[in-house]
């Protein structure tokens, strides 16, 4: 199973944005 660079980049971007959203949610509490 080969993962293209574009797919890996999109996965990292989605994961990063999820982490940022989680951190901002915790800070707002």
Curated annotation (Swiss-Prot):
Matching InterPro entries: BsrE-like
Location in or out of the cell: Cell membrane
Chain segments annotated as transmembrane: 6-26
Keyword Cell membrane part of the UniProt annotation: yes
Induction and repression of expression: Accumulates by 2 hours post-innoculation and into stationary phase in rich media.
Alphabetical UniProt keywords: Cell membrane, Membrane, Toxin-antitoxin system, Transmembrane, Transmembrane helix
Pfam families: Hol_Tox
Membrane topology, as annotated: Single-pass membrane protein
General function of this protein: Possible toxic component of a type I toxin-antitoxin (TA) system; an overlapping antisense RNA has been identified.
Further remarks about this protein from its record: Encoded in the skin prophage.
Protein's recorded name: Probable small toxic protein BsrH
Biological classification of the source: Bacteria, Bacillati, Bacillota, Bacilli, Bacillales
Gene name, Swiss-Prot/TrEMBL: bsrH
